Amino acid sequence: TQYHVVPKIVYGAKAYHFSKKKHNSYKTIMKVHIASIPKNSEVFISVGEIDCRPDEGFIVAAKKRNKPIEELISITVKEHLKWFSEHNKDQNHNIHFFNLPAPVYDKKLDKVINANAANTVALFNMFLAQHIVLHDFNLIDVYKFTVGKNGFSNNFFHIDNRHLSPKIITEIEPQIRNM
């Protein structure tokens, strides 16, 4: 089967934005993207990396709200998947979610902050794997290929401190073929 790849980007989107009941611009843009893709298409979605950064998202919210980070991540992952499921009903896309790559150890930050970021990514991926099966979505695992010592990036697939290089495609393609 031949496929035509068309990137659709929602800049700055977090899983958090899709987990909230209230309307927001991220949801609007994503709805337009979902509707613009021919029905019954293979759709790949990657959100959550920004949510797991040490200076925003779950780590900051857990401190501010004095709530366990596990609770925030679990609810956010569950609700954002539910949002995508609801907005895919009319389109009937086969949706594939990427989990998060292991974070690159940031030498500008101390060990505790780096450990918190690595733990947050691991928790996000764990809850994503748990909740994704409830929606008949597929999981593309990039974490297992990017994780090295202590939960941090092995620096083989990262092109910079946050983004993966095209080298990761050799690990993604077999996962897609086996679905």
Regions found by a protein language model. Name each.
Residues 1-79:
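Conserved SGNH/GDSL esterase-like catalytic core that processes O-acyl groups on lipids
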Residues 2-7, 94, 136-138:
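Conserved beta-strand segments of alpha/beta enzyme cores
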Residues 48-51, 60, 84-119, 144:
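Active-site segments of SGNH/GDSL-like serine hydrolases
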Residues 54-69, 105-113, 153-157:
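Surface-exposed, active-site-proximal loop segments in enzymatic domains
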Residues 64-75, 112-123, 159-164:
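Alpha-helix N-cap and loop-to-helix initiation/capping positions
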Residues 96-101, 136-154:
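Acidic carboxylate-rich catalytic motifs and surrounding loops in phosphoryl-/glycosyl-chemistry enzymes
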Residues 105-142, 167-169:
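Substrate-gating cap/lid alpha-helix
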Residues 134-138, 154-179:
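Histidine-centered active-site loop/cap adjacent to the catalytic His
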